[in-house]
Swiss-Prot record:
Cysteines engaged in disulfide bonds, as pairs: none
Keyword Magnesium among UniProt keywords: no
Protein name: NADH-quinone oxidoreductase subunit E
Organism in which the protein naturally occurs: Rickettsia bellii (strain RML369-C)
Top-level taxon of the source organism: Bacteria
SUPFAM superfamilies (UniProt xref): Thioredoxin-like
Gene encoding the protein: nuoE
Cofactor binding mode and count: Binds 1 [2Fe-2S] cluster.
This enzyme's EC code(s): 7.1.1.-
Keyword Metal-binding among UniProt keywords: yes
Length: 167
């Protein structure tokens, strides 16, 4: 996985999509497109945002790089280093912890053979402990890429990993 990216630009399809996104905002408020454009850049780049992608989006929105960087570092949906094909985010905030998220995290570490904030050697999985996913009523909760998995047990988590491993 190339972590030394020195240049970034949207491909033709994403550039058109980015322009359509920006048009949804008034000209004086186009900076408000920062979240969807960073997300678009991250998706184009395999699930993470290198500095050149953040710079590119900031320039496109005519805003200082540092403002775009602040947004990218504030939200856990943005990854500033490479992640696996299946990016597993385990919520460990109090409601999830009370319902066993520590066991879910332990299961993931043991099953994948990695620690928090690591990627498996085959780059199929990455694991990170995060704060609230906003689904406390169904704790413990894990987000894998764009999907939520709720009311988990260690056994259910193992089955999910096995299924993803075989996909």
């Amino acid at each position: 996985m190339n972590t030394k990216i020195t240049n970034f630009s949207f491909d033709k399809k994403n550039l058109s999509l980015a322009e359509d996104i920006i048009k949804k905002y008034p000209p004086e408020g186009k900076r408000s497109a920062i979240l969807p454009l960073l997300d678009l850049a991250q998706r184009q780049n395999g699930g993470w945002l290198p500095v050149p992608a953040i710079e590119y989006v900031a320039n496109m929105l005519e805003m200082p790089y540092m403002r775009a960087y602040e947004v990218a570092t504030f939200y856990t949906m943005f990854n500033l280093k490479p992640v696996g094909k299946n990016h597993i985010q385990v919520c460990t905030t109090t409601p999830c912890w009370l319902r066993g998220s520590d066991d879910i995290m332990k299961t993931c570490k043991e099953k994948l053979g990695i620690k928090d904030e690591e990627v498996t050697k085959d780059q199929k999985f990455s694991l990170i402990e995060i704060e609230c996913l906003g689904a406390c009523v169904n704790a413990p909760v894990v987000q894998i890429n764009d999907d939520y998995y709720e009311d988990l047990t260690p056994e259910k988590m193992e089955a999910i990993i096995d299924k993803l491993r075989n996909d």
